[in-house]
């Protein structure tokens, strides 16, 4: 078992159950998340018997960096090799408010979005909470920067690995560790309706983003197989439920694809669908991938779409393009190396 799989409370319980004082857990946690050690033997204020105990029961993630690409805009994309030889991706993105990490939750993905490179390689397994945590640790060490926010938007559907990604949040959010505030963490889902409703009752102030990408079932079904299970209307109802329970705004993710979902008429339809909801729309320039025969929406169309939403009183932003020159779209780097 990975040491990063333990919450602070679980580590404390383990230490106490083995006859040691609670403060030792505090020391170990500090070594893990402040000093970012990669071997228990590096903890020079921990007795040797505790180090032996840890070595006998836990391991480090052992992520090996296969590829590290840096974009002209400062985006850094990592391809990591797990201990079982599976490959995952992590991306660091530079913003004016700090460095954001986009983490992966699964090896492969079963959602099967037609525009995405991740779905070409089907899901092999879920990542543990510790394997998700390890991406942050490794990315920080490799880049020399501190991650101040997290987006759970890498390879995989987080709500299909619900228990582990929720545990991951509790670990990185702990004030004595990485201390990344809940409001600086965003989880993105393709629209697993039951899990959206369950997440509403979790009681943490993590941001929710929903990949909608279309205002109707005809277009969305072309883009996302998940729409065969959960129609647009069901997803929107789940979003309304989440907003009602949490009183929190939801981000609507909308990848703009030329001549498919980027017309002014489609923008009007989207505005009507979202009317009166506490949401904002994130308009995303499509990162072309060789696995899909789609093209990025023209700047003219993106601007017109954005203008139309604003005219209909829908808050929307045109997301800045990042990492296009290093294949930073989800799943691209992994698919090229398998």
UniProtKB/Swiss-Prot annotation:
Stated EC number for the protein is 2.1.1.192
InterPro entries linked to this entry: Aldolase_TIM (IPR013785), Elp3/MiaA/NifB-like_rSAM (IPR006638), Methyltransferase_A (IPR040072), RlmN_N (IPR048641), RNA_MTrfase_RlmN (IPR027492), rRNA_lsu_MTrfase_RlmN/Cfr (IPR004383), rSAM (IPR007197)
Q: Which Pfam families match?
A: Radical_SAM, RlmN_N
Its chief place of residence is cytoplasm
Q: Which Gene3D superfamilies match?
A: 1.10.150.530, Aldolase class I
Annotated S-adenosyl-L-methionine binding lies at: 156-157, 188, 211-213, 287
Q: Where is the active site?
A: 89 (proton acceptor), 330 (s-methylcysteine intermediate)
Q: Do the record's keywords include Lipid biosynthesis?
A: no
**What's the superkingdom here?**
Bacteria
SUPFAM superfamilies for the chain? Radical SAM enzymes
Looking at the keywords, is Iron-sulfur present? yes
What positions does the entry give for [4Fe-4S] cluster binding? 109, 113, 116
Q: How is the cofactor bound?
A: Binds 1 [4Fe-4S] cluster. The cluster is coordinated with 3 cysteines and an exchangeable S-adenosyl-L-methionine.
The record's GO molecular-function terms, alphabetically, read:
4 iron, 4 sulfur cluster binding; metal ion binding; rRNA (adenine(2503)-C2-)-methyltransferase activity; rRNA binding; tRNA (adenine(37)-C2)-methyltransferase activity; tRNA binding
Q: What are the GO cellular component annotations? A: cytoplasm
Location within or outside the cell:
Cytoplasm
Role summary: Specifically methylates position 2 of adenine 2503 in 23S rRNA and position 2 of adenine 37 in tRNAs.
Xref: NCBIfam families? rRNA_mod_RlmN
Q: What else is known?
A: Reaction proceeds by a ping-pong mechanism involving intermediate methylation of a conserved cysteine residue.
From the Swiss-Prot or TrEMBL record, give the protein name: Probable dual-specificity RNA methyltransferase RlmN
Q: Which organism is this protein's natural source?
A: Acholeplasma laidlawii (strain PG-8A)
Upper lineage ranks? Bacteria, Bacillati, Mycoplasmatota, Mollicutes, Acholeplasmatales
Q: Which gene name belongs to this protein? A: rlmN
